[in-house]
Amino acid sequence: MKDSYISIVIAYLMVTFILVSSMPIEGEKGELGPHRLPCPPGYENYCFNGKCVHVVAQDEPGKPCYSCICDEFYIGERCGTLDLTNPGYFLKG
């Protein structure tokens, strides 16, 4: 009984992971969503390899929160690191 419960939980987690990982990233299709706005002028180069967004929900008084939506194969706070662990990078033609 315990083994079947564990198998069901593992199957559920795997299906959830597959469904979530296949969802488009918010902002990927030109839609930033209700809590994200384009960054103001002057922040065009804030993200090294990505797009700057103003995350309104994370703002503190007098301190706006800016974040990056990284280009494919880039990771990090400002998209400055090439993710060589992504096998798709080596298959890119």
Swiss-Prot record:
Gene Ontology cellular component terms for the protein in this record: extracellular region
Origin: domain of life: Eukaryota
SUPFAM superfamilies the record matches: EGF/Laminin
Tissues where this protein is expressed: Expressed by the venom gland.
Keywords: Disulfide bond, EGF-like domain, Neurotoxin, Secreted, Signal, Toxin
Localization of this protein: Secreted
Family under the similarity heading: Belongs to the EGF domain peptide family.
Function: Ant peptide with probable defensive activity which acts as a potent agonist of the mammalian epidermal growth factor receptor (EGFR). Mimics, both structurally and functionally, vertebrate epidermal growth factor (EGF) peptide hormones. In vivo, intraplantar injection in mice causes long-lasting (several days) hypersensitivity of the injected paw to both mechanical and thermal stimuli. Its long-lasting effect is unusual for venom toxins whose effects are usually immediate.
Protein name per Swiss-Prot or TrEMBL: OMEGA-ectatommitoxin(02)-Rm1c
Species assigned in the record: Rhytidoponera metallica (Australian green-headed ant)
